[in-house]
Amino acid sequence: MKPIFCFILACNTFIAAFSQDFHITLSGGATNYSGDLQVKRYTFDQSHPAIALGLAYGLNEKLYIRSQVMLGKLSAHDKFNPLTAMRNLNFTSSLTEVNVAAEYYLRDMSEYAVSPYLFAGMAAYHFNPYTNDTTGTKYFLQPLSTEGQGFYQDRQPYKLTQFAIPFGGGVKLALGENIRVGIEFGIRKLFTDYFDDVSTTYIDPNLLLANRGPKTLELAYRGSELKNGLPYQTGENRGSAKFKDWYYFTGITTSIRLGNRNGSRIKSRSRLGCPTKI
């Protein structure tokens, strides 16, 4: 009985000591994307709400390792851009991301109440672009092969779960010893140009019709739905494969330390008490 009691006591002591270096993180804000249907590098136009929940571990008061799960939505429509309005394409996609990153504070937050920070890491994300036809029926775009993926030349179907490189920064304010709030901007470098299902050129409509049917032909080019819409030419640019797509997050983040800071392992490496400098 005594060994069991000692084991339980040791486990509780270990968990209590290490939990005080952990922070629960919660972020809320907006996601947007930059690509063939949204050429602006950064804008709130067509943005959507997003939320992220995670856990951060403090190696010291300036360097943290964090992991998050983010849920969001991305969309864009040619009608908002005069240069591409005649193409009339659009997409919407849900977004699920899991990331791990290192977060570095430029100032010791045990001493300073405010500090800018930078982060970079790795992420896996899942997307699935879709559109609605003129009757309002929803169609997922990847199975349609709108640019001939899977049967035309060397164009291969794109994967719906891929890797990205998240990086960015922000500013955090310490509200006492255990709570921090801040503003964060994070960019995701993607390795696909098909987040929006648009990348290369139009293929022969007869070939598209023969291999994927009338619905793919209808949704591959939607300029014909417009009053003065013109037909496309085979080989004409549908998008630009020169640049990959991006998406980004802007929002407010909050972190709460698990356990009281007094007695934590960080305590032995830094000053005690609330930050005293701005």
What residue spans do the PLM features occupy?
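Outer-membrane beta-barrel proteins
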Residues: 33-39, 75-80, 126-132, 191-196, ...
